[in-house]
């Protein structure tokens, strides 16, 4: 996960995952995800092994449909952060991710206070689309463990 830099935008200073808009050179949505991962945090895109696609998530403040993917690399990466976009990397343990408890947080979105599902991870509030993606990952992983 990443902490986005502070900037004039709807995702300023929020916890999320690398990502962005599809570009002409991208051959697929997964290729977009790989490119963004390499650009934002320096993980070599050709080293990432795709596990599966998660459910698309609509993000009202930015009016985007996000198409998340789960992938992994088989080594500890040397992160190279894009300082324009990423403030820091947040690396919770796998155990932490699998044992999250959903809480509710009040957040301000476009001058409107909303109650949204969230998690606390390493003293950071993770909410919105990021929380939805993590929750789906947890459900899928626990299903595999119980199969």
Name what the model sees in each region.
Residues 7, 22-121, 125-126, 135, ...:
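Unchanged
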Residues 1-17:
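N-terminal strand-loop-strand
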Residues 17, 92, 129:
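A conserved hydrophobic position in a structured secondary element of the catalytic/binding core
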């Amino acid at each position: 996960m990443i902490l986005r830099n502070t900037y004039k935008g709807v995702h300023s200073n929020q916890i999320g995952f690398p990502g962005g808009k599809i570009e002409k050179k991208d051959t697929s949505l997964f290729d977009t995800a790989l490119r963004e991962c390499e650009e934002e945090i320096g993980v070599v895109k050709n080293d990432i092994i795709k596990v599966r696609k998660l459910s698309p998530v609509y993000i009202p403040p930015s009016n985007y449909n996000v198409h998340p993917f789960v992938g992994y690399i088989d080594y500890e990466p040397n992160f190279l952060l894009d300082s324009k976009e990423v403030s820091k990397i947040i690396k919770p343990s796998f155990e932490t991710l699998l044992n999250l408890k959903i809480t509710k947080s009040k957040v301000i979105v476009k001058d409107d206070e909303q109650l949204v599902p969230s998690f606390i991870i390493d003293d950071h509030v993770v909410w919105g689309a990021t929380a939805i993606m993590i929750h789906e990952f947890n459900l899928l992983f626990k299903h595999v463990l119980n199969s």
